[in-house]
Amino acid sequence: MEIGTEISRKIRSAIKGKLQELGAYVDEELPDYIMVMVANKKSQDQMTEDLSLFLGNNTIRFTVWLHGVLDKLRSVTTEPSSLKSPDTSIFDSNVPSNKSSFSRGDERRHEAAIPPLAVSSSRPEKRDSRVSTSSQEHKSTNVRHSYDDGASTRLMSTVKPLREPAPSEDVIDIKPEPDDLIDEDLNFVQENSLSQKKPTVTLTYGSSRPSIEIYRPPASRNADTGTHLNRPQLQQQQSSTHTAKQLDGQSSQVYEAGRLCEPEVLGSVEDTYSPFFRNNLDKMNIEEENFRKRKLPVVSSVVKVKRFSHDGEEEEEDEDYGTRVGSLSSSVSVPAKPERRPSLPPSKQANKNLILKAISEAQESVTKTTNYPAVPQKQTLPVAPRTRTSQEEVLAEMVQGQNRAPRISPPVKEEEAKGDNAEKIEGTQQRQLLSRLQIDPVTVDTMELSQDYYDMESMVHADTRSFILKKPKLSEEIVVTPNQDSGMKTADALRVLSGHLMQTRDLVQPDKPASPKFIVTLDGVPSPPGYMSDQEEEMCFEGMKPVNQTSASNKGLRGLLHPQQLHLLSRQLEDPDGSFSNAEMTDLSVAQKPEKLLERCKYWPACKNGDECVYHHPISPCKAFPNCKFAEKCLFVHPNCKYDAKCTKADCPFTHMSRRGPVLTPKPAVSSPAPSSNGQFCRYFPACKKMECPFYHPKHCRFNTQCTRPDCTFYHPTITVPPRHALKWIRPQTSE
């Protein structure tokens, strides 16, 4: 049981280190969740689907790495040679350390390849586990050199015990695979390096017993041809130090990165490797200071040794100088945390199946998200009030669309020649608006506006209301021939005829054009229909219906304007010199005013339209009051009623400022019900006391005298009924 717990703890620490490297580690919940999936033997595709929410673009990279580790664990447990090995080399793929040492051994020179990921399991006998980092470089020959233990220049890595495992614990050794992209994660690779061979990185836990590293078969390691290939190595280690590994080459030595800056190391190396050593001295000093500033305890570190050579002497340098001094790579620090122990006894702990089920259901609910459609881009167009009639809306939209026309100066063909996407979009909107309105060609010609008129829009008050119009797709195109002179005059006439229907935005007053223009005010024109009540709107439009109803279906000007207005408009269009007189323009504005109806406004004196109301508002007092027979319909002023809205008199001759409620009509006289056909009406009713009277007795109304229905067929007594308390029987008290 302790072996499985230790293996699970090692896998979890490796997963946590990988998540920290990818920047996806937040708390302990994600590693726990991944361990649950490992325990459930989820496939790589299932893990990729479940972890995509947390890891994003790094999901595939993480799952490939995790399944590679699990595959190595399975191969180790099934391989008898790994079980017989006295000790293992433990490597960590993504949890670097600060303490490192370089061991030396036998190796051959092969084609360069990234070291494979190997996992081995054994039981170390000593409680004093040590961490060592070995980095090898391959040379051109297979000459073996013995390492002198007594030499003063010998570099031996000192390792401190990081933990003391139990004697029966399993130890996991993890080495980087090609999928780990360790070259991308280690940032200390110099760009101008001339050497194409990459060093191998090995992290090992050592003990007093020899350890065997387990590698993948050679067939699976020959994928890339520009990297190194490693052979299984036999490492023997002393109780306090590691046995040095021999490297091929002449006088080649690998120095521990953590001791490169010590004085005795510098004294022995600087004479031989001074041109290369001094280049990287500053970088190593900076890295040494960075490691000293670490606040959290460090588990392990990855060290990369880089070779340097000149352009013309690459082969000679490899043989003569051997391994060059490298610099420290970047490292990831992980605090060593004790294993979490449950605070509750096993009998009181929650069922693991329920926890796994809840986690799976939560994951399913998170992944099943709703895909909302993209919000379409919208466009706002200023328009007049929303309560216009359909003909008025058509007229306003035509003018608004033509006002935007000068900004879209080139037509469709010219836009395509220029290739301007913005102008194409605006031209498409204009054509779609015109095609949606379905305007006659003659009307379109008369409604064309010029740039000069577009600059004159500031003389009309602005309207802040607008409606939302979705951007339409390109539909049928309508090519409009510009006619600036007629468009200017048409717009002026339309502003006069429908000034109360069309409101545009304020613009800066531009330079005055040379052509004559008419400044028309809106004095005396009724308010827009949006400010009226429903009754007033019906009253106003009774006198404003167009005469020619058949032409109104064309949605043009003829269906909206009266014959007199059309006549004046045509005269203005035919006048080329602009000599349309102001007198005729005044006649035109007067002609559009509806005549007052000889009917008193029922909202007076609280009518909101004031003088613009088409109904009569009394001014002079009534001379026949109070004997006026017209009452509230009188065209003259009557005094105010003191009861106002509370007045219940239907024919009250006084004026009521507030709107009164429905007046109850007087209840008609109740007619006695007719006798039924099968019996005569009882002559003694309602005083008849005979219980078995064969004559007709009408039923009493349940509401009695409180009944308000004038056509009620039930009997209503004419005498008053005693109150309820008088009809209550009380038992008389008997004297004792």
Curated annotation (Swiss-Prot):
Write down a Pfam family by its short name: zf-CCCH_2
What InterPro entries does its record include? Nab2/ZC3H14, Znf_CCCH
Q: Where is the composition biased (Polar residues)?
A: 77-103, 367-380
Q: Where are the transmembrane segments?
A: none
Gene3D superfamilies registered for this protein in UniProt = 4.10.1000.30, 4.10.1000.40, PWI domain
Primary site of residence: nucleus
List every position bearing Phosphoserine.
S85, S240, S309, S327, S343, S390, S409, S498, S515, S527, S620
| GO MF entry, a single one | poly(A) binding
Lineage, top-rank taxon, reads Eukaryota
Which keywords fit this entry according to its UniProt record? Acetylation, Differentiation, Isopeptide bond, Metal-binding, Nucleus, Phosphoprotein, Repeat, RNA-binding, Spermatogenesis, Ubl conjugation, Zinc, Zinc-finger
GO BP: mRNA stabilization; regulation of mRNA stability; spermatogenesis; spliceosome-depend formation of circular RNA
Give the compositionally biased regions (Basic and acidic residues).
123-148
Any one cellular component term from GO for this entry?
dendrite cytoplasm
Crosslink (Glycyl lysine isopeptide (Lys-Gly) (interchain with G-Cter in SUMO2)) position: K99, K139, K175, K198, K245, K283, K295, K357, K378, K413, K489
In residue numbers, the zinc fingers (C3H1-type) are 595-620, 621-640, 641-656, 682-699, 701-719
Compartment list: Nucleus speckle
Region described as Disordered: spans on this chain? 77-153, 308-350, 367-386, 400-420
Residue numbers bearing the N6-acetyllysine modification? K357
Q: Which residues carry this modification: N-acetylmethionine?
A: M1
- Fill in the subunit field for this protein: Homodimer; facilitating circular RNAs (circRNAs) formation. Associates with the spliceosome. Interacts with HOOK2. Interacts with ZFC3H1 in a RNase-sensitive manner.
The UniProt function text for this chain reads:
RNA-binding protein involved in the biogenesis of circular RNAs (circRNAs), which are produced by back-splicing circularization of pre-mRNAs. Acts by binding to both exon-intron boundary and 3'-UTR of pre-mRNAs to promote circRNA biogenesis through dimerization and the association with the spliceosome. Required for spermatogenesis via involvement in circRNA biogenesis. Regulates the pre-mRNA processing of ATP5MC1; preventing its degradation. Also binds the poly(A) tail of mRNAs; controlling poly(A) length in neuronal cells.
Instruction: Return the PANTHER family for the record.
Output: ZINC FINGER CCCH DOMAIN-CONTAINING PROTEIN 14 (PTHR14738:SF29)
Spell out the family assignment given in the record's similarity comment. Belongs to the ZC3H14 family.
Question: What's the protein here called?
Answer: Zinc finger CCCH domain-containing protein 14
Species in which this protein is naturally found: Rattus norvegicus (Rat)
Organism phylogeny: Eukaryota, Metazoa, Chordata, Craniata, Vertebrata
